[in-house]
C-alpha cells in the first residue's frame, strides 16, 4: 500500500513540501492589494499516484478552509486542482488552469478541477448567472454547477470527495449556520489524468481583484492492489 497524507495550517514559500508558482506568494501592490491580471498556484511537492495498470479506483476527501475578500468588484475565484504538470496557465476567468482561447484557439487542458467561482459574469465560459461551485474536466466550461451562498469576508469550509466504486466526484461548501450547496459528476480519472499527478490550489485575477486566503488544507490518500491486481487509491484532502 502507498499513501499520501498532509495537513497545512500555514503556507510559507520556504516550506519544502509546497511548490509556489506565479503570484501565490501574496504578490501585493504598494497599497497592500493583490495584483490584477495575475495567477498563482500552490502544489504539494510529492506526486500522487491515481491509478495502477490502467485501473482507477480512487477515493478522496479534500477539506479546505477558504477566506475570500474583495473591496470593489468580485474577481475570479479559486480552484482545487489535480493537474498532470506544473505549468501555470492564463489568468482571469481561466483560473491559471487553461489557455486563453482568444490567443491560442483552445480553452482546454488535461486537468480536473473543482472551482469556487465568485465571478459569474463570464457567459463565454458557460457560467451560470450566479456565484457557484463547479466541476471542470479538461475545460473551463464546468460539467456541473451549483449555486454557492458565498459570504464576502467570511471563512468557508469546502469538502471534496471522489468515490472509487461509484466513480463520483463531489463537492460541498458551506458557512457555519447556513446551507450546504453541493454538486457531483461521474468520471473515471484514468481517462483524463496520467498515473501520477500533483494536487494543489490555483487562483487568478483579471481586471478586478480579490484576495483568496486558504486558512488550512488537509489531504490523505492510499493506494491498494486487490487480488485481481486492480489499483485502488483513496484520497482525502
Curated annotation (Swiss-Prot):
Mn(2+) binds at residues 115, 117, 127, 132. Keywords: Calcium, Glycoprotein, Lectin, Manganese, Mannose-binding, Metal-binding. This is Lectin. Ca(2+) binds at residues 117, 120, 122, 127. The keyword Membrane does not apply. The lineage of its organism: Eukaryota, Viridiplantae, Streptophyta, Embryophyta, Tracheophyta. The N-terminus of alpha chain is blocked. The alpha and beta chains are produced by proteolytic processing, with probably the loss of intervening amino acid(s). InterPro entries: ConA-like_dom_sf, L-lectin, Lectin_LegA_CS, Lectin_legB_Mn/Ca_BS, Legume_lectin_dom, Leguminous_Lectin. Pfam families: Lectin_legB. D-mannose/D-glucose-binding lectin. Requires Ca(2+) and Mn(2+) ions for full activity. GO terms for molecular function: D-mannose binding; metal ion binding. It comes from the Eukaryota. Belongs to the leguminous lectin family. The modification Blocked amino end (Ile) is found at residue 106. Glycans are attached at residue 69. Tetramer of two alpha and two beta chains.
Amino acid at each position: 500500500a502507498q499513501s499520501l497524507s498532509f495537513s497545512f495550517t500555514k503556507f510559507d514559500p520556504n516550506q519544502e513540501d509546497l511548490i509556489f508558482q506565479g503570484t501565490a506568494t501574496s504578490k501585493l501592490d504598494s497599497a497592500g492589494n493583490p495584483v490584477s491580471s495575475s495567477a498563482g498556484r500552490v502544489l504539494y511537492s510529492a506526486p500522487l499516484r491515481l491509478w495502477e495498470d490502467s485501473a482507477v479506483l480512487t477515493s478522496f476527501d479534500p477539506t479546505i478552509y477558504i477566506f475570500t475578500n474583495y473591496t470593489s468588484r468580485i474577481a475570479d475565484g479559486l480552484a482545487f486542482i489535480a493537474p498532470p504538470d506544473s505549468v501555470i496557465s492564463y489568468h482571469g476567468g481561466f483560473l491559471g488552469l487553461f489557455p486563453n482561447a482568444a490567443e491560442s484557439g483552445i480553452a482546454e487542458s488535461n486537468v480536473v478541477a473543482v472551482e469556487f467561482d465568485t465571478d459569474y459574469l463570464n457567459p463565454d465560459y458557460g457560467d451560470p448567472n450566479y456565484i457557484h461551485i463547479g466541476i471542470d474536466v479538461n475545460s473551463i466550461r464546468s460539467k456541473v454547477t451549483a449555486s454557492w451562498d458565498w459570504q464576502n469576508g467570511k471563512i468557508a469550509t469546502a469538502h471534496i470527495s471522489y468515490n472509487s466504486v461509484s466513480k463520483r466526484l463531489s463537492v460541498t461548501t458551506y458557512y457555519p449556520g447556513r446551507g450546504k450547496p453541493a454538486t457531483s459528476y461521474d468520471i473515471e480519472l484514468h481517462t483524463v489524468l496520467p498515473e501520477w499527478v500533483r494536487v494543489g490550489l490555483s487562483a487568478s485575477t483579471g481586471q478586478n481583484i480579490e484576495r483568496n486566503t486558504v486558512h488550512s488544507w488537509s489531504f490523505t490518500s492510499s493506494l491498494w492492489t486487490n487480488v485481481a491486481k486492480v489499483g485502488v487509491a483513496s484520497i482525502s484532502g
